[in-house]
Each structure stands twice: as C-alpha cells, then as structure tokens.
Amino acid sequence: MRRYETIFIADPDLSPENQAQLFEKATTLIDANSGVLVEFDEWGTRRLAYEIRKKPRGHYVRLDFCGDGATVQGLENAFRIDERVLKFMTVFLSENADPEALRQAIAEEKEKKAEGQAAADAAPADGDDEAPKQPAPASDDDAPKQPETEAGSDETEAAAADKSDDNA
C-alpha cells in the first residue's frame, strides 16, 4: 500500500457536532475506498495566510493513511463537493508502507514524548540541581576584544606569492 498525507482546512464556524460529522466522513471515506487510517491529527483553529471564502481563520486537520489512487481520488472528490472544507492537499509519502508498523512506530514515539515530558516536568520541581545562571553580554561591545595580529596578513601574502608563481 502507498502512504499518503492529506491536510485539509475546515470552516472554523462549524459547530462541534458538524465538525465531528465532517471528520467522521473523512475517516469513513478512507475505509470505504480500501484504505487504512494510520493517524488522525487535529491541529485546531489557526489564522490563515490569506482569506479563503472571506474567512481569516481555518480549522486544520491532518490525515495520515495508506491506500491506493482510488482512496485518494474518493477523498478528494468528497472534499471538492463539501462546502465545509475550505482547502485540502494530499501528498504521497512512500511506496510500500505497512499500516500496522506505522501505527506502532507512532505509538512508541508518543510514549517516548510523554516520558520525556514527564521527566521534564519532574526536573524543575527539584530546583537545587541547576547551575547558577550568569547573564550573557548585552552586545558585542561588552565582549572582550582580541588583539589583531599580523600573522593573518603574512598568510595572505604567502598565498598570493604562490598564486603568482603558478601563473608564471
């Protein structure tokens, strides 16, 4: 199976029930067209770079799925017809993808991230292990200046002499 990623922008003015219905429709379309949903990632409402249908904001959703061309075509056709979808884009990710292996890898990654977050939350609670913080210099003027040496100019003169010998 091929792996695809579709990001679509839904109308931000939709009620939560209507949003849930749209998201359910997208996931069932993938299943109906012999596809397998790997990950459903809701990014939330964000400001658009430019207005789409006179709306400055949009609700972003990312679908990671495996399927074939018919799966992508069915999903995109439904998005073109549905007025609740402002924009969408599908990208091909890989040729031979195993949906179960991808799900396991994503689950493991989320576990590691959760463990790392839990460790990060626990570390500031101790507070005694941290080194005292020193202020950084405000600008380059405060930094100590290195005296300029003439060694750099000798090197450039030697390089120029070598170059002139090569040309002669």
Curated annotation (Swiss-Prot):
Keywords: Ribonucleoprotein, Ribosomal protein, RNA-binding, rRNA-binding
Native source organism of the sequence: Desulfosudis oleivorans (strain DSM 6200 / JCM 39069 / Hxd3) (Desulfococcus oleovorans)
GO cellular component assignments: cytoplasm; ribonucleoprotein complex; ribosome
Family membership: Belongs to the bacterial ribosomal protein bS6 family.
GO molecular function: small ribosomal subunit rRNA binding; structural constituent of ribosome
Function text: Binds together with bS18 to 16S ribosomal RNA.
Entry's Gene Ontology BP terms: translation
Official protein name in the record: Small ribosomal subunit protein bS6
InterPro entries reported in the protein's UniProt record: Ribosomal_bS6 (IPR000529), Ribosomal_bS6_CS (IPR020815), Ribosomal_bS6_sf (IPR035980), Ribosomal_S6_plastid/chlpt (IPR020814), Transl_elong_EF1B/ribsomal_bS6 (IPR014717)
Composition bias type Basic and acidic residues, residue spans: 106-115
Amino acid composition bias (Low complexity), ranges on this chain: 116-125
